[in-house]
């Protein structure tokens, strides 16, 4: 029962999928971050469904672009937009944290979101779907969430409030770090075995860059910054997927 509650908590927080509602408590939040990658698995399965449906090419590309947004409800895009505004302000740490708390969408967020979707749609249109490509992308969507959850359990927090702090405080951080680190290693190995080593390399490099930006710019991570990392990683892994396909590696 606790396992199901843990999964439900993860899906209730990180997706728009209707799930039974449980009150958050010490037991069902302890390993909720370990269930976070399952949201990526669902995104990948639906992405593959979109790939095999007899859709016109533009509709298929739009589906590839929108499936992750529909599944997650845009929660990570919200963090991406807020973080783009904060980092573009070039203010001090407190100024950036204040911008992250501001519910309004600034000019830089709008510009970056439009650019993001234009790039994502263009890359999605370039993907030639095959079962192997579907498997690679599903692994990638799971991997980015494994790294995101690992960061919440391992990186310093920028503040003592917010959802990232709530999940980090409630988690058995040692166990979560170990589980997600092992999962990330296995996923990277699977990507490499399928010819998608470039996707794993991109994810690892962005994970390291994420730590650098978080510590240098904000003194640690926040929920918004976690969303920014996930969306950045997804876009660049999609570019790597296209590059692998163009290069004949997959």
List each language-model region with its residue ranges.
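Acidic (Asp/Glu-rich) catalytic motifs at the cytosolic membrane interface
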Residues: 67-105, 212-233
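C-terminal ends of transmembrane helices
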Residues: 18-23, 75, 95, 149-159, ...
């Amino acid at each position: 029962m606790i396992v199901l509650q843990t999964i439900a908590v993860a899906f209730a927080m990180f997706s728009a999928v209707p799930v039974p509602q449980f009150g958050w408590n010490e037991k069902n939040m302890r390993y909720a971050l370990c269930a976070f990658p399952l949201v990526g698995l669902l995104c990948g399965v639906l992405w593959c469904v979109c790939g095999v449906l007899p859709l016109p090419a533009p509709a298929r590309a739009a589906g590839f672009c929108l499936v992750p947004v529909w599944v997650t409800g845009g929660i990570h895009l919200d963090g991406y937009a807020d973080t783009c505004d904060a980092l573009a302000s070039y203010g001090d740490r407190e100024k950036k944290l204040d911008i992250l708390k501001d519910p309004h969408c600034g000019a830089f967020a709008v510009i970056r979101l439009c650019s993001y979707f234009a790039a994502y749609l263009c890359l999605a249109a370039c993907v030639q779907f095959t079962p192997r490509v579907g498997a690679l992308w599903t692994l990638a969507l799971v991997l980015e969430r494994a790294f995101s959850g690992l960061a919440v359990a391992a990186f310093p927090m920028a503040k003592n409030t917010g959802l990232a702090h709530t999940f980090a405080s409630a988690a058995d951080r040692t166990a979560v770090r170990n589980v997600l680190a092992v999962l990330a290693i296995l996923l990277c190995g699977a990507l490499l075995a399928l010819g998608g080593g470039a996707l794993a390399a991109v994810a690892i490099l962005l994970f390291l860059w994420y730590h650098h930006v978080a510590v240098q710019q904000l003194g640690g991570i926040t929920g918004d910054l976690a969303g920014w990392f996930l969306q950045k990683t997804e876009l660049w892994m999609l570019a790597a997927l296209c590059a692998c396909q163009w290069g004949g590696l997959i």
